[in-house]
Amino acid sequence: MFAGGADGGNGHLPRPRRARRGGGGGGGMGSPPLGPPPPPCTDYDMAYFKAYSHIGVHEEMLKDHVRTNTYRNAIMHHQDLISGKVVLDVGCGTGVLSIFCAFAGAARVYAVDASDIALQAMEIVRENELSDKVIVLHGRIEDVEIEEKVDVIISEWMGYMLLYESMLGSVIFARDKWLKPGGLILPSHASLYLAPITNSHRYQDSVYFWQDVYGIKMSSMMPLAKQCAFMEPSVETISGENVLTWPSVVAQVDCYTIQAPELETITATFNYTSMLQAPLHGFAFWFDVEFNGPVRQRSKKQANQCLDGNTQDASPSNKKKKADAPIVLSTAPEDAPTHWQQTLLYLFEPIELKKDQNIEGSVTISQSQQHARFLNICLKYFTRDQWYVKESVMK
């Protein structure tokens, strides 16, 4: 499920995990609304879209009950803002979210996807006798035409560590071109978190395994094993027991106000205190998204203050739920697992930490200049009287 354009070129395609969405469009009745010129669709984009036409990625997403049920609950929670309205599903995939919106009473749903899975979505819509309500458009969000404004935009745009694949830009494109003033965006807000972790089992499986293999000494393989296992970010599931400190907030996104250039580079500082004595094996990213109605929009300054590098405390005292708390989809280690898992940056050499030991530094996440869907990650941290730097590319 795919939304929009990225930098072109040949080379390493993004890992085919969950599908990325294709976008949709629309404007006011009559002349299509004016908007920014669409980015070109490159050969690289076409190969990327083709990779996600495979049924497996959609099966994985639909079998993620946390993800799918949270979206369905959020749609029904906002039924009063969806019933009788026009909805745009940016990157519809199999069309499940579009159909949920139709069940919630939407007058019309434009379901858009750039991958060939859109052809299957058409059949699914027809099978459910919703062709009079759900209009499937096969194309990029930047290229399709819809001759009316929309009241609601829904999209499952999140990639690994929230921002991988750069699909949020396509949601922004759709918002600026077609969303009516005061319209609804689901999800409405997102937060990206970072925390130091310990994971001895991972080192045992990937590195220390080579010390003795069937009675044969293979320690000479360990340096290569570390390079292969820990050079790039790793997507895997950890538990709350692996996390050494309360997380810090790397970025917060308000989908009502965020602009695409703000996503090009994000920098945040952190200052952690280890809650136990354990080896520091790396750092973990995870995210959550909220489903807020328009009346709960935050100011642009408040919503994006972390994009300016300000750190916020994400401890439980700052995450207490209020009576009117929004629906939240979380990928945190302590919550039910999802297909996003967590994104881990492992160190080549563990660092022994004492209880209450300090770890401070900064993290910078930037879109790759070669392939906009890739992320460059630079982690700088200071502990035990020494500075360290970990640089990785999420691709």
Swiss-Prot record:
Belongs to the class I-like SAM-binding methyltransferase superfamily. Protein arginine N-methyltransferase family. PRMT6 subfamily. Residues 302-317 have a biased composition (Polar residues). SUPFAM superfamilies: S-adenosyl-L-methionine-dependent methyltransferases. CDD domains: AdoMet_MTases. InterPro entries: Arg_MeTrfase, PRMT_dom, SAM-dependent_MTases_sf. Residues 1-37, 300-324 are annotated as: Disordered. The active site is at residues 156, 165. This is Probable protein arginine N-methyltransferase 6.2. Residues 45-390 form the SAM-dependent MTase PRMT-type domain. Residues 1-11 have a biased composition (Gly residues). It holds the Pfam family PrmA. One of its GO terms (biological process) is methylation. Keywords: Methyltransferase, S-adenosyl-L-methionine, Transferase. Arginine methyltransferase that can both catalyze the formation of omega-N monomethylarginine (MMA) and asymmetrical dimethylarginine (aDMA). GO terms for molecular function: histone methyltransferase activity; protein-arginine N-methyltransferase activity. Its EC number is 2.1.1.-. The keyword DNA-binding does not apply. It is an enzyme of class 2 (transferase). S-adenosyl-L-methionine binds at residues 58, 67, 91, 113, 142. PANTHER family: PROTEIN ARGININE N-METHYLTRANSFERASE, PROTEIN ARGININE N-METHYLTRANSFERASE 6.
